[in-house]
Every structure is written in structure tokens, then in C-alpha cells.
Amino acid sequence: CIVCGNKKLNKFLDLGKTALANNFLEPEDLNLIDEEFYPLRVAYCNNCFHVQLIDHVNPKKMFDNYLYISSASKTLTDHLYSLAKVITRKIPFKRNDLVIDIGSNDGTLLSSFKKIDKKLEVLGVEPAKNLVKFANKKNINCVNSYLDIEVAKGIVSNYGNARLVTSTNSFPHIQNLHNFMNSVNELLSDDGVFVLEAHYLVDLFEQKAFDTVYHCLLYTSDAADDRMR
């Protein structure tokens, strides 16, 4: 189990071997015999009851060049702007407070924060080089890396601690959850806030949204609350 380390996972869904999500082939790559496929099996832990994938793809294969762009979806763009508005109402930001978005994609969420509160400083952490270029065009500064404790220490050294750290739908892709949370803790100031957004398992079942089952972790509210403590 990614969360508690328990060795016993109970499989309840097997979607067979599946190509990488958001991985579009060029015309010269259409020899499907050479396309990579991976098992897509879903299980729950009989200790902490977290639902998760049994098999994990090397993150570099999925995210070093990522083709899903947040701003391409008006629905998502509007949602992220609304999220930024809710957060800025709840947190009494001061001038030059730092907001860090983990898995910042093309900077859509951070751009929303800048529109709503121009006194904020923002920083993205994004492993996909192509997405960092899009963010930079929006004047969003990014660290082109996966987050770990050493990267977090480097960010604090260069930019200071964050009043807010966000992770919207990058959080369910995290394979080393404990390292990630330690890194977030390193980034946060003493009064810092961490906001995460993840797929809700109950909605997935009710909507039969099997097409979203490629995230490492799928959360219920109770399981998320328990593990964040």
C-alpha cells in the first residue's frame, strides 16, 4: 500500500493493459505493435482501506512531456479561478506572500491567484518541460522538477517559505506519498496552508467514471482525513 505500507491489496477492478493516458502518437509512431501498454488494476488496502492502482508507471514516462494543458479546458479554467477566489477569501494574505502550486501545469491556477490578488508572489513546481514553457509565457516562474525534500529545501533557500501550497489533481499521482508530504511541510511557513484536490471515490463509482482510473490513489473523505493527520 502506498499509504500505510501494508502488503495485502485486494483487487476489485481489472481494466486490462492500457496505453498511457494523454499520450498522443505522432503519425510515424502509429505502429501500435511498438506502443507501450501497462496493466490497469485497482485494489483497496485491507488495513487503511485506501483505493489505489496495483501497478505503477515510471513518472518520467508520464510527466516529463505532458500533453494535458489546463487552460485548454474552459470548465477547468473557470473551476481553478473559483478555487483561487475561495482560498483568497479564507486566507488573510499579506503583501509578497508566496503561493506554490505543485504540478502547476501551464500556470492556470497561479495566474488566477495573480489576477485576484496582485500582491502575491507565485511559483510553480512542474516536471514537464513543455508546460513550463507555456507557464513562462504567462510570466509564471517555475521550478522544472518533481518535488522531493531536496527540491523543497532549494525552493525555501531561493524563494522563502510558502503561505500556501496547492496540489490540484497532481496529488493522486504521487507514488511516494510520505516523501511528498514531508516536502510540502518543508515548503510551508509556520502559518502555512496546504490545499489539495483529488478525485472523490464515491463520485467515481456513482458516475461510472472508469476513464479517470489512471491515478495512483483514489480518495474517500474519511481516508484522506485520516492520512493527512
Predicted regions and their residues:
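Single conserved hydrophobic/aromatic residue that forms the stacking wall/gate
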Residues: 219, 223-229
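Conserved class I S-adenosyl-L-methionine
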Residues: 96-105
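Conserved SAM-binding strand-loop segment of SAM-dependent methyltransferases
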Residues: 139-151
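Short, glycine-/aromatic-enriched active-site segment of Class I SAM-dependent methyltransferases
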Residues: 196-218
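N-terminal juxtadomain amphipathic helix
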Residues: 2-75
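Conserved SAM-binding loop of SAM-dependent methyltransferases across substrates and taxa
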Residues: 106-117
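A short glycine-rich, Lys/Arg-flanked "PGG" loop and its adjoining helix->strand segment in the class I
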Residues: 179-193
